[in-house]
UniProtKB/Swiss-Prot annotation:
Highest taxon of source: Bacteria
Protein name: Small ribosomal subunit protein uS3
Complex and partners: Part of the 30S ribosomal subunit. Forms a tight complex with proteins S10 and S14.
Pfam families per record: KH_2, Ribosomal_S3_C
Record SMART domains: KH
Organism taxonomic ancestry: Bacteria, Pseudomonadati, Pseudomonadota, Alphaproteobacteria, Rhodospirillales
Keywords for this protein: Ribonucleoprotein, Ribosomal protein, RNA-binding, rRNA-binding
Designated gene of the protein: rpsC
Length: 225
């Protein structure tokens, strides 16, 4: 049943680590809700910045937020004005000091979350779903992906009956735990209703048993700002 489970959750502790990295005893529920609130706020505020991941760490009663984005300039703003304002807002929400790191995604065409969001925005603009899917697959394969699969479901093209369409190229070995598979979803809100987009990108195999392996790859590609 490897096809049914979330590929990220299945690989936690093998070649992928958690997006919230902290330990709490009594305050666990409070901090968890705080994390959810911070993520929701950032994803809404930075919609135009192409945010893929938000990592939250809590060393010594502080919060360290790392934003993985395709457009760091949009997050930072002119002379760093926007990022300072953002840091202040996050500090108020978290009730303490928050440090912000911005990590640039050099190849957004290989990031599953960004691919899904791009296809969803095209569906909202009434671009033909097959063309949007095919274009995304071609871009990913051209930039070095070993395999990609895209699922689009809902009232595609305004059809009366909802259905699922998928497109795949290359290998996407969901059962292989050492496979570096990136998974992302997005929702397109069209006039006919919502359409769901799921994307799996296979980037190769990670042979070392290292939960931080995927993060190290990302950091090698783009130094943090």
């Amino acid at each position: 049943m490897g096809q049914k489970v979330n590929p990220v959750g299945l690989r936690l502790g093998i070649n992928r680590t958690w997006d919230s990295r902290w330990f709490a005893a009594r305050d666990y529920a409070v901090l968890l809700h705080q994390d959810l609130k911070l993520r929701k706020f950032l994803q809404g505020k930075l919609q135009a910045a192409g945010v893929s991941r938000i990592v939250i760490e809590r060393p010594a009663k502080k919060a360290r937020v790392t934003i993985h984005t395709a457009r760091p300039g949009v997050v930072i703003g002119k002379k760093g004005a926007d990022i300072e304002k953002l840091r202040g807002t996050l500090g108020t929400m978290a009730g303490g000091e928050v440090s912000l790191n911005i990590v640039e995604i050099r190849k957004p065409e290989l990031d599953a979350r960004l691919i899904a969001e791009n296809i969803a925005s095209q569906l909202e603009r009434r671009v033909a779903f097959r063309r949007a899917m095919k274009r995304a697959v071609q871009s990913a394969m051209r930039l070095g992906a070993q395999g990609i699969r895209i699922n689009c479901s809902g009232r595609l093209g305004g059809a009366e009956i909802a259905r699922l369409e998928w497109y795949r190229e290359g290998r996407v070995p969901l059962h292989t735990l050492r496979a570096d598979i990136d998974y992302g979803t997005a929702t397109a809100k069209t006039t006919y209703g919502t359409c769901g987009v799921k994307v799996w990108v296979f980037k190769g195999e990670i042979l070392a048993h290292d939960p931080m392996a995927q993060d190290k790859r990302a950091m090698e590609q783009a130094p943090a700002r």
